[in-house]
Curated annotation (Swiss-Prot):
Gene designation: y01F
Name the record gives this protein: Uncharacterized 18.3 kDa protein in modB-mrh intergenic region
Domain of life: Viruses
Any Pfam family the entry gives: T4_MRH
Length: 156
């Protein structure tokens, strides 16, 4: 039996002041036929993320899961992260090796989304690998304190 799956592209965006930076352009999500795929898609889109993170999901095409899909049934969601060389910047999502250059792609993770538990696991995995700066924003006063301490050698 050939199942039709929905293929979505995913982008994580970060709002830094007035500008918007793309965290990752190389994401794809395949949601196979489930009991209620529309509910799964709605749940992903309505998830609450930190205020400076935007998750964009766009439907790109329908594919035949058993013929046209480049993924196996256990490999449906592929996300790649790239390192940014900036002290307060955005680091890659999934890179374990922190000595790689900014231009080198990181390791990817793959998931298939079939129910809400899979979405929860995906969201936990993403936030576990985001740089802390994306979840905790320093105030101007906190930033000045850190910069002053750094001048006196209290931080590396």
């Amino acid at each position: 039996m050939i199942e039709v799956a929905k293929l979505y592209s995913i982008e994580f965006m970060s709002k830094e002041g007035k500008s918007v930076n793309t965290l990752d352009k190389n994401c794809s999500l395949i949601i196979p036929l489930a009991e209620n795929p529309d509910f799964l898609i709605k749940d992903i889109k309505e998830r609450k993320y930190p205020e400076n993170i935007i998750l964009i999901i766009k439907h790109t095409e329908d594919i035949l899961q058993n013929t046209d899909s480049p993924f196996s049934s256990s490999e449906a969601l592929t996300i790649k992260g790239y390192k940014r060389a900036h002290e307060y910047g955005l680091f890659d999502m999934f890179e374990d090796d922190k000595v790689k250059l900014a231009s080198q792609p990181s390791k990817s993770k793959t998931f298939i989304i079939e129910d809400i538990k899979d979405i929860n696991a995906f969201v936990r995995m993403v936030w576990a690998h985001f740089d802390v700066g994306l979840r905790w924003r320093m105030s101007e006063e906190e930033r000045k304190i850190i910069e002053t301490n750094r001048k006196f050698g209290f931080y590396r």
